[in-house]
Every structure is written in C-alpha cells, then in structure tokens.
C-alpha cells in the first residue's frame, strides 16, 4: 500500500447535524431536557434499589445496574454533544474519541447481557418459584452481573483497539454525533476486513445469544402463564414481565438497526449523515436510557411504592 499520503490524525471533527443548522438548537434543548430526566430517573431507581428493602431482590439488583449503566453511557457522550451543538466546537482529540468509543461499546455490550440475565431471572421466578431463592441467590446474581460488565469491557477493549490502530490518511471528519465505531472505520485507509469479522462475532455474542436467551425464557414463561388457572396469578406474571419486555423491544429494535445490518452497506454509505440514521442514533443513545426508568416505574408496583416511600420520607425530613 502506498504510505506517502498516510498521516497520523491527532483529532477528529464530528459533523453531527452541521448540515441542518436550524435543527441544532431544537436538538440541543431536547437532548438537554432528556439528559436531566435520565440522571434524575435512573438516579432515583438506583437509590430506591439500595435503600428500600422490598427491592433487595435479583431483578432490582439487575435494574439498578442497568440504571447505573445508562447514566455512565449518556454521561460519556451527551455533554460533549451538547457543547458541539451550542458552541459549534466539533473537534475531539484522538484519545477522547477512543475513550468515547470504548464507553459507548462497553455499555451497549453490557446492557445486552444484562437484559438477557433479567429475562433468565424472570424465567426462574415464574417457572420455578420454589427453587428461585436457591437458584438466584446473591452469589449467583452478583456473579452474573460481574460477568456482564467484564465481558462488555473486554469486548469494547478489543473493538476499540482494532478500530483506532489504523492510519486515517489525514481524513478526520466523522459523519456522526459521536465517535461511533462504524463511522470511524469509514475513515480508515487500510483493509478493515478484520474489524468486520470481529464485529460480526461480537454481534453474535452480544446481540444474538442474549436475544435467544430472552426469546426462550419468554416462551417458557408464556407456557407457564397459560397453564396457570388463577387469573390473578396470570395478571401478576404479565405485569412483572411487561416492563422488561418493553425495554428489550425498544433497545434491540434500535441496536439491530444500527449494528446488525450488513457492514459493507454501512461502511460504504453516503458521506453525509442521513437524518434517519441520526434520529435512530439519538433514540438509542438518549431516548432509550430516558425511557427505562419511566417504563419500570410505571409498570412495576414495587418500584412505584419504593419511589413514593422515598419521596414521602424526604418530604417529612424537610
């Protein structure tokens, strides 16, 4: 390969919505409001899961980790996006881009595994209620959560290292809001077939396998619910699973759109960021973390009771 034109990039420029200047102020206001909701909503869920003894169960331990994950993910990306929207400062350092890519990929991978663990937890609770305390004891659910975080971190380390090691031939303009891995790989002037293969393997491990766990868990749950004679029992089982299932549909719907389409199609796409792609990216990165605590607090009686208890206790203390 001709190496004359290859130069090391010291920083990147994130185009974002620069092609739609009238939308930038609107997006700034929307993202800012949603970020505040994310911090408050997920923060309340974390505090409630720690302080309220009624939530000291595996499901709420997973939920607390999911809320913490959403805060970490959005905090690694939203503040810089807000700054670029309001100040027109669109440059990000090479190391800053790598850090942003790492956290985004790590949090996404971890969330896939966490959602799978939560589905398995619901399967054991509904299909094997008598053995639930034995199967899902504290050692088990803490270990499952630790594996989720560790595997997500390892996957992100591998993908980020492979993506950032290529020469970029002086081309440093990223057609995205963030240092998203596919957008960065478009700038590489080397053969990225290794990245495509590793991303495909990652998709199988972190998208397909957890989704299979979720699918079969809910098949067994549905079978058990339909066999239940008690209408109250069926309603309780459905209400317990509905929040998680809603989050799964929203999360996997957006992430499959972004990462499960053919890589050649994505990497050879148009130079300008499509409006639909930008909206889906924002939905995945901002709207989904905002909806998670809202969905769980609206659908789950225990969470609603815990939040009301915390708010009432705070009002009394004041």
UniProtKB/Swiss-Prot annotation:
Single Gene Ontology BP annotation: detection of chemical stimulus involved in sensory perception of smell
Compartmental location: Cell membrane
InterPro entries: GPCR_Rhodpsn, GPCR_Rhodpsn_7TM, Olfact_rcpt
Glycosylation sites: 5
Intervals, Extracellular compartment: 1-25, 76-99, 161-197, 259-277
Residues spanning the membrane: 26-46, 55-75, 100-120, 140-160, 198-217, 238-258, 278-298
One GO MF term attached to the UniProt entry: olfactory receptor activity
Residue spans, topological domain Cytoplasmic: 47-54, 121-139, 218-237, 299-318
Pfam families from the UniProt entry: 7tm_4 (PF13853)
Membrane topology: Multi-pass membrane protein
Keyword list, A-Z: Cell membrane, Disulfide bond, G-protein coupled receptor, Glycoprotein, Membrane, Olfaction, Receptor, Sensory transduction, Transducer, Transmembrane, Transmembrane helix
CDD domains: 7tmA_OR13-like (cd15430)
Disulfide bonding pattern of the chain: 97-189
Domain of life: Eukaryota
Protein's UniProt keywords contain Mitochondrion: no
Cross-referenced Gene3D superfamilies: Rhodopsin 7-helix transmembrane proteins
Keyword Transmembrane in record: yes
Record-stated family: Belongs to the G-protein coupled receptor 1 family.
Function comment: Odorant receptor.
UniProt protein name: Olfactory receptor 13C4
Organism per entry: Homo sapiens
Gene name for this UniProt entry: OR13C4
């Amino acid at each position: 390969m001709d190496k004359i034109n290859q130069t090391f990039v010291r920083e990147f420029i994130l185009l974002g919505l620069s092609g739609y200047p009238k939308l930038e102020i609107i997006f700034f206001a929307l993202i800012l409001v949603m970020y505040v909701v994310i911090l408050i909503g997920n923060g309340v869920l974390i505090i409630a899961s720690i302080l309220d003894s009624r939530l000291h169960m595996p499901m709420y331990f997973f939920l607390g980790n999911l809320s913490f994950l959403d805060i970490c993910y959005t905090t690694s990306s939203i503040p810089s996006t807000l700054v670029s929207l309001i100040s027109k400062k669109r440059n990000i350092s090479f190391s800053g881009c790598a850090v942003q890519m790492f956290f985004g990929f790590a949090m996404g991978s971890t969330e896939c595994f966490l959602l799978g663990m939560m589905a398995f937890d619901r399967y054991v609770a509904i299909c094997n209620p008598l053995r639930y305390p034995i199967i899902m004891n504290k050692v088990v659910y803490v270990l499952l959560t630790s594996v989720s975080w560790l595997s997500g971190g390892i996957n992100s380390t591998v993908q980020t290292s492979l993506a950032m090691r290529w020469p970029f031939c002086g081309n440093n303009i990223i057609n995205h809001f963030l240092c998203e891995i596919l957008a960065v790989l478009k700038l590489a002037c080397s053969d990225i077939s290794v990245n495509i293969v590793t991303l495909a393997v990652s998709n199988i491990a972190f998208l397909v396998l957890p989704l299979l766990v979720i699918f079969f868990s809910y098949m067994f749950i549905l079978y058990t619910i339909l066999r239940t004679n008690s209408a109250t029992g069926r309603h309780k089982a459905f209400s317990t699973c509905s929040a998680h299932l809603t989050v799964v549909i929203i999360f996997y719907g957006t992430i499959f759109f972004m990462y499960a389409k053919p890589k050649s199609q994505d990497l050879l796409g148009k130079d300008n960021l499509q409006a639909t792609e930008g909206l889906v990216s924002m939905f995945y990165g901002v709207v989904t973390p905002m909806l998670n605590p809202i969905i769980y607090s609206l659908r789950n009686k225990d969470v609603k009771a815990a939040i009301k208890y915390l708010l009432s206790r705070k009002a009394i203390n004041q």
